Amino acid sequence: MFVKISEQPSLYNDLEKKSVREILEDINTEDQKVALAVQRAIPQIEKLVTQIVPRMKQGGRIFYMGAGTSGRLGVLDASEIPPTFGMPPTLVIGLIAGGDPVENAEDDIHRGWEELTERNITDKDTVIGIAASGTTPYVIGAMHEAREHGILTGCITSNPDSPMAAEADVAIEMIVGPEYVTGSSRMKSGTGQKMILNMITTSVMIQLGRVKGNKMVNMQLSNKKLVDRGTRMIVEELGLDYGKAKALLLMHGSVKKAVDAYRI
């Protein structure tokens, strides 16, 4: 039987009677459970990543789908891919119910698939549903249709055996237990979702060759700090002085291109 663990009563009571220190320590105690829950989900995360990579090598994309906090986290992770890895913003796309962070659009079971078809989704793409409850109609409808069309589906949820997981080729079930404030899934569930999204996109981008050693050699040079960081990467890699390294970087636009051009 499907049980919404994420909606179960908090392990703590009379929160309004607690001191600030007690509240903070309680929240921190609960947050420490999140990393362990994510650790237990690593085999499923690995399974999803290893299926995403070959699809992306063929031109596939990742679509995150969610509502509320879950949707916003998908949009956030997607927005970090271009500056961090120098990839186009069309490669990882976050879709949120309503098109913007609108709270009530999540009950439309058809709209999610409509948004995917508007973006010409293909069987090279991957759809990842994000919902702590695992019951969001907007997400479930999109995943169902995607799967019917032979598209890889994954999900991230805080409840076992959810309706959303039933539509996933790979279900990442991150069981963090009841929230500190009962039902407030922006807390532990949201923290765990962000950790897993980081793991998915970072490991995918590494597998796609967007990291060298441990460095973001394809990052966008969008501010002075990143230009300085990129320059120091080139100094370390090629042994040039700072001025020459910076000039080389600015000429070619990325650390990788600058290093490759210098070595030709």
Task: Identify the function of each model-found stretch.
Residues M1-E16, T117, E148, L240-I264:
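N-terminal charge/polar-biased segments
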Residues V204-I264:
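Short, amphipathic alpha-helical interaction segments embedded in low-complexity terminal/linker regions
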Residues F63, A67-M195, V204-L208:
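Glycine-rich phosphate-binding loops that contact phosphosugars or nucleotide phosphates
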Residues G60, I151, L240:
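Short glycine/serine/threonine/alanine-rich loop segments
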Residues E30-R40, P101-V102, T126-G129:
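Short, basic, glycine/proline-bearing loop/turn elements
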